[in-house]
């Protein structure tokens, strides 16, 4: 039975209570306050819903993750990185990145990054928890992604690309930095062929929860504005 969250409580049900079908649906309701979002990610779940739906919280089993040291870079991407066709920055224009991620796409109906979702993550960015990666071609923003950094874990949310392989350049650059900064795991949430091409793989939800317990409260060496 689906758990409905109360607005005055930031607690989530145990991950083991998530539904098998649809895979990982854990709870519904609540709000998108910064406190609840932080509680959700620390618990191992994330919001994902369409505009007009109640807020839905998910914790799929298995969980798709990328260990930074397992990053796979194709020959074509390695060549592109060497060419330095694009310039990559961090936390320079979070609002523009999340707005671009929310923009309509030809292969999808609607967007799950609603206006309320954008505002919620902008607040997390102001708190130094949500971060953006920008990919520039000259002075034009042509790609990027955003996510949350808590302890030694990075929770990826969404990416976009307006130029060939721009988001791939941004993601590969981010993973390299995360490894340098001592991050141990990148949460990719759901499997995609794009992520698997980088070396992402599925692990049991219980294993993912163990990483949360062991690494969420450990410091990293992150310097997002360096």
Swiss-Prot record:
Function: Functions in the N-end rule pathway of protein degradation where it conjugates Leu, Phe and, less efficiently, Met from aminoacyl-tRNAs to the N-termini of proteins containing an N-terminal arginine or lysine.
Chief location category: cytoplasm
EC number: 2.3.2.6
Name of the featured protein: Leucyl/phenylalanyl-tRNA--protein transferase
Organism, scientific name: Ectopseudomonas mendocina (strain ymp) (Pseudomonas mendocina)
GO molecular function: leucyl-tRNA--protein transferase activity
Keyword Repeat found: no
The reaction(s) this protein catalyses: N-terminal L-lysyl-[protein] + L-leucyl-tRNA(Leu) = N-terminal L-leucyl-L-lysyl-[protein] + tRNA(Leu) + H(+); N-terminal L-arginyl-[protein] + L-leucyl-tRNA(Leu) = N-terminal L-leucyl-L-arginyl-[protein] + tRNA(Leu) + H(+); L-phenylalanyl-tRNA(Phe) + an N-terminal L-alpha-aminoacyl-[protein] = an N-terminal L-phenylalanyl-L-alpha-aminoacyl-[protein] + tRNA(Phe)
Presence of the UniProt keyword Disulfide bond in the record: no
Superkingdom of origin: Bacteria
Cell compartments where the protein resides: Cytoplasm
A GO CC annotation given for this chain: cytoplasm
Stored InterPro entries: Acyl_CoA_acyltransferase (IPR016181), Leu/Phe-tRNA_Trfase (IPR004616), Leu/Phe-tRNA_Trfase_C (IPR042203), Leu/Phe-tRNA_Trfase_N (IPR042221)
């Amino acid at each position: 039975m689906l758990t409905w969250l109360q607005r005055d409580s930031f607690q989530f049900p145990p991950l083991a209570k998530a539904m098998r079908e649809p895979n990982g649906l854990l709870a519904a309701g609540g709000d998108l306050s910064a406190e609840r979002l932080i509680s959700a990610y620390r618990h191992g779940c994330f919001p994902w819903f369409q505009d007009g739906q109640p807020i839905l919280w998910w914790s799929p089993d298995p969980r798709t993750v990328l260990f930074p040291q397992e990053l796979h870079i194709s020959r074509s991407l390695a060549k592109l990185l060497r060419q330095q066709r694009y310039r990559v920055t961090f936390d320079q224009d979070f609002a523009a990145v999340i707005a671009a991620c929310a923009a309509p796409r030809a292969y999808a109906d609607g967007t799950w990054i609603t206006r309320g979702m954008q505002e919620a993550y902008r607040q997390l960015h102001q708190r130094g928890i949500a971060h953006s990666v920008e990919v520039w071609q000259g002075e034009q923003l042509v790609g990027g992604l955003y996510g949350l950094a808590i302890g030694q874990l990075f929770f990826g949310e969404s990416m976009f690309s307006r130029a060939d392989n721009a988001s791939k350049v941004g993601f590969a650059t981010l993973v390299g930095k995360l490894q340098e900064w001592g991050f141990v795991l990148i949460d990719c949430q759901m499997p995609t062929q794009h992520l698997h091409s980088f070396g992402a793989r599925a692990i049991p939800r219980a294993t993912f929860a163990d990483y949360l317990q062991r690494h969420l409260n450990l410091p990293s060496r992150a310097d997002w504005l360096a």
